[in-house]
Structures are given as C-alpha cells and as structure tokens.
C-alpha cells in the first residue's frame, strides 16, 4: 500500500471542506493495482496529475461517491482503469452518483459497479 495523497501533513491546517484532507492510496498485489480515492475531488486530482504521480490502476474506487466534483476526464485519462467501483448508499439524499460521472465512465468505456444497485462488491486478484 502506498499513500499518494496528501503530500504534506494536514495537522494544524484549516481546510475549506473535509474532502481536502482526504487520503488516497494505491493497493498493489502482484500486477493488480487498485486506486482508493476516498472523497477526493477535482482540485486534488489535478494536483496529483500536475506532480506526475503514477495513477495507473486496474480498479478505480470512484471519488466522493460519484459526485460531480470528482472523477474528471483528465483524471480518468491518467488512471485508465479497467473497471470502476462506486460506493454509494441507496436512495441517498445527494442523489449520487451523478449522471455526469456515469456519462464520463461510459465515454471512456469503463464498466462500473455500484454498491446501491449491485450490493457488496468483492475485488479478487491473483
């Protein structure tokens, strides 16, 4: 497991939203890589891309439950996932995932699974 974000400690710092203090990790087992984004939003995605962090992953846990503020086209180009997982509650008040994120995944031909419609999702590796 490698922690990719944050780059610096958030201790003693103020954030506009709690999502700015999000932790993002990559799990690698053999050749399989899984990117866990937590509630990461577009500004952090852009920062990771600008710093040329290797984001390539086979499995992407979609950021911020599929909110419109995450999973940008630029981020999807950097990650190039084979499949995406969206952790979201059924009939949630925010109506996540948003149609814009689902459309982006479709445009990139990335199949996805949602916990609200698919239930528990298990990712297996060699």
Segment roles from a protein language model:
Residues 1-126:
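Non-globular, low-confidence helical/coil segments that flank catalytic cores
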């Amino acid at each position: 497991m490698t922690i990719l974000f944050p780059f610096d400690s958030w201790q003693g710092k103020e954030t506009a939203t709690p999502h700015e203090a999000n932790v993002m990790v990559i799990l690698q087992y053999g050749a399989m890589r899984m990117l866990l984004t937590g509630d990461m939003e577009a500004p952090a995605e852009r920062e990771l891309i600008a710093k040329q962090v290797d984001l390539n992953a086979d499995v992407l846990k979609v950021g911020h439950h599929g909110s419109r503020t995450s999973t940008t086209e630029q981020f999807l180009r950097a990650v190039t996932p084979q499949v995406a997982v969206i952790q979201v509650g059924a009939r949630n008040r925010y109506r996540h995932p948003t149609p814009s994120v689902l459309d982006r995944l479709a445009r990139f031909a990335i199949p996805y699974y949602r916990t609200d419609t698919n239930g528990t999702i298990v990712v297996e590796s060699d």
